[in-house]
């Protein structure tokens, strides 16, 4: 079973191929940095312009055609509003054209799944800007990764307090939110916080594809019409409209 995973929820977009739970190929594109000259995905400014070349690049790397895929997996958020819409629209288009099933995966869950060699609590933090993070706590025991808190957007201070409430004195935290607020996390836990880059999967797309595998194996998938992004908070445009009305 070959799954194509796609993530554009963060500044680093990624696509990956996972076969029977094992990573076959992956490609990453960080829009905050210039693409390397030898990269098949050239710097084009935004996810809308690079997502299709990114998918084609990972298919080429894995020597896989769309017709050979068993399904598509996509991160549904939280994350960049525009990025989430682009990924979902792209995946739905491919699914309709090729008759492929689709599974949506929480970006925070995929982020936590990038850590395998750790038993216990994992704090998944994605940078939501404005001194806020998208945040959830997970617990890994063996091969099982279980959410133990709701997914939410909150201040970094609130996330730190939640980790403390979970009884963690040296929490393992992962994600660009953990990196962005590393000094605060280090101070809060006396330098004992473990900032992890991920030891199992280098990209969110690979983790997304791997997490979807069980559902595909059970012949389960999401309804395309009802599959929508998980934003967790209102957009700037919605906030401005609400302020104008009030």
Indicate residue ranges for each PLM-predicted region:
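Surface "functional belts" at beta-alpha junctions
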Residues: 22, 30-36, 40-43, 101-202, ...
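N-terminal beta-alpha supersecondary unit
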Residues: 1-76
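Acyltransferase
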Residues: 194-246
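Generic secondary-structure signature for well-ordered alpha-helical cores
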Residues: 60, 64, 143, 165, ...
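Stable alpha-helical structural segments in soluble proteins, enriched in small hydrophobic residues
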Residues: 58-62, 97, 115, 208-216
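DPxDG-like acidic metal-binding loop motif
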Residues: 73-102
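Phosphate-handling active-site elements
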Residues: 60-68, 95-105, 220
């Amino acid at each position: 079973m070959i799954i194509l995973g796609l993530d554009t929820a963060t500044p680093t977009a990624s696509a990956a191929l996972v076969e029977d739970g094992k990573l076959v190929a992956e490609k990453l594109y960080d829009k905050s940095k210039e693409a390397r000259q030898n990269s098949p995905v050239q710097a084009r400014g935004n996810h809308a312009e690079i997502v299709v070349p990114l998918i084609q690049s990972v298919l080429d790397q894995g020597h896989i055609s769309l017709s050979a895929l068993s399904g598509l997996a996509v991160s549904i958020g939280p994350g960049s509003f525009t990025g989430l819409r682009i990924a979902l629209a792209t995946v739905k288009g491919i699914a309709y054209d090729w008759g492929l099933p689709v599974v949506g995966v929480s970006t925070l869950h995929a982020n936590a799944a990038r850590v395998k060699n750790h038993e216990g609590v994992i704090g998944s933090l994605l940078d939501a800007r404005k001194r806020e993070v998208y945040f959830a706590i997970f617990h890994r025991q063996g091969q099982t990764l279980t959410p133990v808190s709701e997914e939410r957007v909150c201040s970094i201070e609130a996330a730190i307090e939640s980790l403390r409430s979970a009884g963690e004195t040296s929490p393992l935290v992962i994600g660009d939110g953990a990196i962005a607020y590393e000094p605060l996390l280090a101070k809060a836990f006396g330098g004992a916080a473990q900032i992890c880059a991920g030891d199992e999967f280098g990209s969110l797309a690979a983790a997304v594809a791997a997490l979807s595998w069980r559902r595909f194996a059970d012949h389960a998938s999401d309804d395309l019409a009802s599959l929508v992004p998980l934003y967790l908070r209102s957009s700037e445009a919605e906030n401005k409209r609400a302020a104008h009305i009030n």
